[in-house]
């Protein structure tokens, strides 16, 4: 049966002459080709009329002009399969019928001296509005001129939207098919011109977008750049604080080692044989070379703590009278800093005194050793002649 249906479709297609698409704009044909490809989802090259009726009927297609389906039924063969050429011919027939019917109604309703028939003239919808098929909109009441002549046209910019053939030849019953379809892009441009001129007359109308211009979208839920910047700054601060904490721990260990060394030296000097022990062990590296750096570190640390205390007090005062500030914390910190400075000064002075004392003891030791050797040499010289005389 399928073979018979295919043979029937081939016989009918050869019997009836295929409609032509000559005289139609290329852009219009491309748009219709896209629509036909959507309907022909199986890529067979033809679409059955029942499929089009099932898609273009119902609640979703209530705005579809009624003449479109009748035009497709007229050009459809007996088997109901529509090729692209027949599909274009059906749409062409529906457009011509709709245009001719509107002109007939306008000609019957027209009276001498009455310009109300211009209200019934239709224009094509702008190209930027979404649509599946061609639709037409009636002109507003403001489009009717107050008086005949060129002055009325110049005072009413809406008359620019009226097709040239309809304005010049109201008694014409039927226009050529190619001219009727070629008016589609010109009508779109005329609608755009009417909207642009409408802004000058006080009508709030939005200018249409140009052909090919895409609609712009704004990202509202994207990544916040300021939040990323703040997170990066916080990470840097955390890294710096961790490095400072590590250096403070190492510095604390070094300070404790130096204190233990100083206390050990004090203990040795307090004993009776401190000089001899020190001379036996050797002189360690003196702290006097590092004293300027130690003092500089203590000064920088004190300035840092002072600036940090003042920096924490500023936001609380700028927020307003939320509560009385606690003066005990800054005073306690200042006292701690002063105490550390005093201890550092005392330790430095003590180390300096001890170093001078050690130097003095070493000099005395050297002098005593020299005197001892001199005394031994003199004693040996004095005892030599006495021994020879006795023998």
Swiss-Prot record:
Region of interest (Disordered), residue spans: 1-20
Keywords: Cell cycle, Cell division, Cell junction, Cell membrane, Coiled coil, Cytoplasm, Membrane, Mitosis, Nucleus, Phosphoprotein, Tight junction
Coiled-coil features, chain-numbered ranges: 226-277, 340-381
KW Transmembrane helix (keyword) present: no
Protein's GO biological process: establishment of mitotic spindle orientation; negative regulation of protein localization to cell cortex; positive regulation of cell population proliferation; regulation of establishment of planar polarity; symmetric cell division
Positions carrying Phosphoserine: 283
Main location: cytoplasm
GO CC terms, sorted: apical cortex; apical junction complex; apical plasma membrane; bicellular tight junction; cytosol; nucleolus; nucleoplasm
Tissue: Expressed in the retina. Expressed in retinal progenitor cells and newly differentiated neurons but not in mature retinal cells (at protein level).
Domain of life (superkingdom): Eukaryota
Location(s) in or outside the cell: Cytoplasm; Nucleus; Cytoplasm, Cell cortex; Apical cell membrane
Modified residues (Phosphothreonine): 218
Subunit structure: Interacts with a spindle orientation complex at least composed of GNAI1, GPSM2 and NUMA1. Interacts with GPSM2 (via TPR motifs); this interaction is required to prevent GPSM2 anchoring at the mitotic apical cortex and is inhibited in presence of NUMA1 in a dose dependent manner. Interacts with PARD3.
Role description: Plays a role in planar mitotic spindle orientation in retinal progenitor cells (RPCs) and promotes the production of symmetric terminal divisions. Negatively regulates the mitotic apical cortex localization of GPSM2. Involved also in positive regulation of cell proliferation and tumor cell growth.
PANTHER family in the record: FI14130P, SUPPRESSOR APC DOMAIN-CONTAINING PROTEIN 2
Protein name: Suppressor APC domain-containing protein 2
Lineage: Eukaryota, Metazoa, Chordata, Craniata, Vertebrata
Gene for this chain: Sapcd2
């Amino acid at each position: 049966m399928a073979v018979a249906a295919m043979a029937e479709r081939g016989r009918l297609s050869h019997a009836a002459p295929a409609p032509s698409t000559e005289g139609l704009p290329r852009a219009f044909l491309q748009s219709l080709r896209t629509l036909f490809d959507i309907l022909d989802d199986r890529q067979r090259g033809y679409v059955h009329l029942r499929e089009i009726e099932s898609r273009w009927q119902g609640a979703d297609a209530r705005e579809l002009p009624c003449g479109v389906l009748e035009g497709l039924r007229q050009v459809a063969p007996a088997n109901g399969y529509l090729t692209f050429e027949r599909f274009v011919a059906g749409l062409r027939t529906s457009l011509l019928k709709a245009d001719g019917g509107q002109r007939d109604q306008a000609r019957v309703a027209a009276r001498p001296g009455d310009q109300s028939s211009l209200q019934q003239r239709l224009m094509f919808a702008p190209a930027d509005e979404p649509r599946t098929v061609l639709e037409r909109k009636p002109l507003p009441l403001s489009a009717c001129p107050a008086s005949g002549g060129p002055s009325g046209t110049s005072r009413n910019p809406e008359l620019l939207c009226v097709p040239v053939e309809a304005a010049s030849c109201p008694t014409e019953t039927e226009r050529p098919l190619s001219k009727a379809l070629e008016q589609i892009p010109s009508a779109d441009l005329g609608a755009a011109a009417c909207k642009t001129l409408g802004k000058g007359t006080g009508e709030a109308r939005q200018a249409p977008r140009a052909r090919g211009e895409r609609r712009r979208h704004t990202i509202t839920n994207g990544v916040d750049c300021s939040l990323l910047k703040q997170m990066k700054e916080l990470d840097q601060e955390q890294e710096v604080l961790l490095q400072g904490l590590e250096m403070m721990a190492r510095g604390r260990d070094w300070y404790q080692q130096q204190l233990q060394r100083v206390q050990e030296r004090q203990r040795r000097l307090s004993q009776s044989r401190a000089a001899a022990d020190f001379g036996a062990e050797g002189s360690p590296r003196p702290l006097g070379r590092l004293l300027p750096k130690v003092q500089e570190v203590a000064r920088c640390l004190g300035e840092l703590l002072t600036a940090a205390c003042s920096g924490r007090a500023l936001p609380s005062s700028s927020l307003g009278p939320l509560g009385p500030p606690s003066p005990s914390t800054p005073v306690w910190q200042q006292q701690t800093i002063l105490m550390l400075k005093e201890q550092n000064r005392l330790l430095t002075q003590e180390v300096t005194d001890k170093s001078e004392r050690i130097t003095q003891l070493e000099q005395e030791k050297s002098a005593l050793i020299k005197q001892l050797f001199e005394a031994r040499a003199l004693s040996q010289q004095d005892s030599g002649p006495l021994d020879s005389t006795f023998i």
